[in-house]
Amino acid sequence: MAEGQSPENSPPAPPPPSPPSPPSSNDQQTTSPPPSDNQETTSPPPPSSPDIAPPPQQQQESPPPPLPENSSDGSSSSSPPPPSDSSSQSQSPPPPSTSPPQQSDNNGNKGNNNENNKGNDGSSGDGGNKNMSHTPPPPSKTSDHSSHSQPRSLAPPTSNSGSNSSSNDGLNIGAVIGLVAAAGILFIVMILLCVCCFRKKKKKSKLDQMPYYGSNAYPAGKTGGDQYYNQNAATQQQQHYNQNDHIVNLPPPPGSMGTNWVSSPPPPPPGNWQPMPSPPAPVSGGANVIQSGEMSSNFSSGPYAPSLPPPHPSVALGFNNSTFTYEELASATQGFSKDRLLGQGGFGYVHKGILPNGKEIAVKSLKAGSGQGEREFQAEVEIISRVHHRHLVSLVGYCSNAGGQRLLVYEFLPNDTLEFHLHGKSGTVMDWPTRLKIALGSAKGLAYLHEDCHPKIIHRDIKASNILLDHNFEAKVADFGLAKLSQDNNTHVSTRVMGTFGYLAPEYASSGKLTEKSDVFSFGVMLLELITGRGPVDLSGDMEDSLVDWARPLCMRVAQDGEYGELVDPFLEHQYEPYEMARMVACAAAAVRHSGRRRPKMSQIVRTLEGDASLDDLDDGVKPKQSSSGGEGSSDYEMGTYGAEMRKFRKVTLESRDYGASSEYGATSEYGLDPSSSSSEEMHIGGSTSKTTTTNRGI
């Protein structure tokens, strides 16, 4: 223990024991301390590493105390290193005095071991200083180097092991952090995907309820009118079609044949249910086109957003379930009262109705007893189930029962028809931007029917009174009662001629060959109405001139000199963009070409109206020649030909009606309470004036 305490007072103690040897040993040891210091300086890294690592090394060096015996037995160079190391360390107290912190850092046990080794080395060193006076230095150096090389060799592994462990820990921590971060990112991505899917489903449900409009004013739900509109949505989904105000000849609710409505036993509705003779009775079973003109888009239903109790439990999602009872529709229209009458025609009447949930609808009642009406009812429902477009009027539901009652329920459009604003008594002049918007919207709806539906759909009755307007004056094509399906591989469909005078394509009126170009011609006539403000026929001249015959040379003149004065509606007062007017005039002139092959597609007209195509694209390689009168000169067309053909066709149809060849011929009152005469022939029957759209509807 005295020796254990001597390290603190080690500087004075060493000189007395062996004055001669210390110098030599010290000299030799003095040379050794620097390396030892250097070795120690290299050894600090182990201490810097975990403090536990160095002690085991010292403890591993402490067990070799038997090594001194080996050193005493022989002065082998291999054995001395441990004792010499211990001796060098035992004789290095003075240097340790300068570096006690290092040894204190290494542990107190090391100093104690050095002191114990010092005593052993002292006894052995005293006996062998003379003999080993010169030899020890080399061994001591070698021993020092070897001894220190061992710790050096040991130290790096410990430091490496520490660094490896620390690096492993770092890698483990980094891996854990990476996994956590990846899991967090994956979780966030999954949440975002769920949110997106939810929004898409929500939007889809809204679109399903009101497929044509992005804004559905009615909350989706199964309460109140929501079920009703879900029916509509499902109806439109299954129908994939915006149901237009389609007039389908099907036995109307109460009425048998004839114009008078027979009071229907079923309806106990609120208003007095009376026969419908009140509306002006159409002439002998006339093929009057009932245009549910006010079929409103979903936009028009905005004010009725609050949901109310459903109209009837039978009203549920899906077209098959979007059926109404006759009592429900009679109640919605106040017993089909005259106050709710929107229009009448050869196939029945159109009334405005309000469902219990506040939704406004247009109810078309079809007359009973007509096989043609039944077929057209089925055709309209079939076609409506195939289409889905925001510029086509949508069908809400229908009523069909064993009593022969056939009713179609459409969305209600508040702004009536294009005909009403152009030729009716609206009291306002439609400005040019609105006219252009209506032309473009109806062109898109018609292009969808021709080019996006398979098989394609030919409307057969495009006219101003079948273009319905929502509260934003967005156009909706209506009335698919005459529409025909045409396979893509069919060049044309041979069918009975149906339509309205002034809009019929010449090849269709003369031969009954129906193609999508027949609709293009009718659309061209409607464009001329928007441009000129005139009707399709000139009633003042007893149909001597049609709008097509009158406007064609003016359109050609506009193309030459750019003068619109005679052609453009004077009520516009030059408030229009010349380049927009030029595009519409070019589209109209190309659409009413006498030859169907030379007319453009509806998609070409859409692009031209939007300004995405040049006017030359409408010609599609066709360069019309100029006649001396300024009209289009071609081998199959001469001035006045269209009007002459229409007069001939009218005569044939009127004669067939007079002889009773078809019960479907007759007078028509265009949609609306104040129908105009633009697309109808003025006829005086029994002292009363009614308008006839001589639609040839064969049995």
From Swiss-Prot:
Residues 148-158, 687-699 have a biased composition (Polar residues). SMART domains: S_TKc. Residues 9-23, 43-68 have a biased composition (Pro residues). It catalyses: L-seryl-[protein] + ATP = O-phospho-L-seryl-[protein] + ADP + H(+); L-threonyl-[protein] + ATP = O-phospho-L-threonyl-[protein] + ADP + H(+). The active site is at D461 (proton acceptor). ATP binds at L342, G343, Q344, G345, G346, F347, G348, Y349, V350, K364. GO terms for cellular component: plasma membrane. The keyword Membrane applies. Residues 194-699 are cytoplasmic. It is found in: Cell membrane. PROSITE patterns: PROTEIN_KINASE_ATP (PS00107), PROTEIN_KINASE_DOM (PS50011), PROTEIN_KINASE_ST (PS00108). The modification Phosphoserine is found at S465, S494. Residues 336-615 form the Protein kinase domain. Mostly expressed in flower buds. This is Proline-rich receptor-like protein kinase PERK7. It comes from Arabidopsis thaliana.
